[in-house]
Amino acid sequence: MPLLLYTCLLWLLSSGLWTVQAMDPNAAYMNTSRHHRVLASVNADFAFSLYKHLVALSPKKNVFISPVSISMALAMLSLGTCGHTRAQLLHGLGFNLTEKSEAEIHQSFQHLHQLLAESDSSLEMTLGNALFLDGSLELLESFSADIKHYYESEVLTLNFQDWATTASRQINGYVKSKTQGKIDDLFSGLNSPAVLILINYIFFKGTWKQPFDLASTREENFYVDETTVVKVPMMFQSGTIRYLHDSELPCQLVQLNYAGNGTVFFILPEKGKMNIVITALSRNTIDRWSAGLTRSQVDLYIPKVTISGAYDFGGVLEDMGIADLFTNHANFSRITQDAQLKLSKVFHKAVLQLSEEGVNTTGSTGVTLNPMSKPIIMRFNQPFLIMVFDHFTWSSLFLGRVVNPA
């Protein structure tokens, strides 16, 4: 019987390097750091690989995903697998089971989940996972206990035979309730039977450490390509901003911080050279950018938009070597022993809102580095990249390519 995995993901957080925290002298901090540092490199490599696969499939479209959320959802799913299916899934996520046990992998994700869930008062964030199982199947209690322990998740039973009037409404109602109405209508229908659905939901609203000037936002042109121009509200701030004109890649970038752990890289490739920059994306590139950014006087223009992406990852994961899940060879015997399951869909949705709000009052939007210096003007009015990371966990929370923000 086919298994349908749906993942709805809405994430926004921030950035950092993958090794620096080992230098912190505080023992408790280092102990916690060890857990999420283990995941950082693995998750980052998976993130860039998945992102590049999606970009290749949609060369002229927006691409926006929450990589760490996808890794977490698939790692959670692996708790229900056995044998070659389990080994292939974890290997596809980047783990070497001869170096790191399955228990250690899930313990690391457990710490990561806890850290991401502990947002400060300046953030509004709701995140969670849930599994919906066909009520005709008997769930193994050990699986339910494991996903509760490691991922704070739960399994709910539904009547999937009555999808239109019962199952879809119950799932949508569950997510709407958990996110206080921020995520609605996760499902509208299925074109094939389902016995198991996995959802992963996140709502995030952050505030900039340095806000954009509300009074300066105005409609401007965004040049999608040589023949397409759209109108977007363009935000503005002027002040001391971390900036880099890359000497190795054809791009400029700035780094902006949210209150709390969030940080965002906005990357502006030269016209026609977007693919060169995307091909070079890696942990080493991010480390080099982080080291090269310098405080500069910048006049910054960024679209005020909602960026989103929704994908069925089935074919992409198969291309990346995670194929057993979708065949009759799939082994989900740690979820139920009542039926032979296989995965039919992996659905992911990510949404990010860019707005002016910050922790400071709007008026003077920045600190001037040198009143006599001519500011660098960065206007994101053509296709650009956005990358959102978390300072504390070094997690890749959003990777995006914005071709048309309208």
Swiss-Prot record:
Residues 1-22 form the signal peptide. Expressed by the liver; secreted in plasma. Glycans are attached at N31, N96, N261, N331, N360. The record marks C251 as: Conserved cysteine within steroid binding domain. One of its GO terms (cellular component) is extracellular space. It comes from the Eukaryota. The keyword Secreted applies. Gene3D superfamilies: Alpha-1-antitrypsin, domain 1, Antithrombin, subunit I, domain 2. Pfam families: Serpin (PF00079). Major transport protein for glucocorticoids and progestins in the blood of almost all vertebrate species. Proteolytic cleavage leads to an important conformation change. This reduces the affinity for steroids. Belongs to the serpin family. PANTHER family: CORTICOSTEROID-BINDING GLOBULIN, SERINE PROTEASE INHIBITOR, SERPIN. This is Corticosteroid-binding globulin. It comes from Saimiri sciureus (Common squirrel monkey).
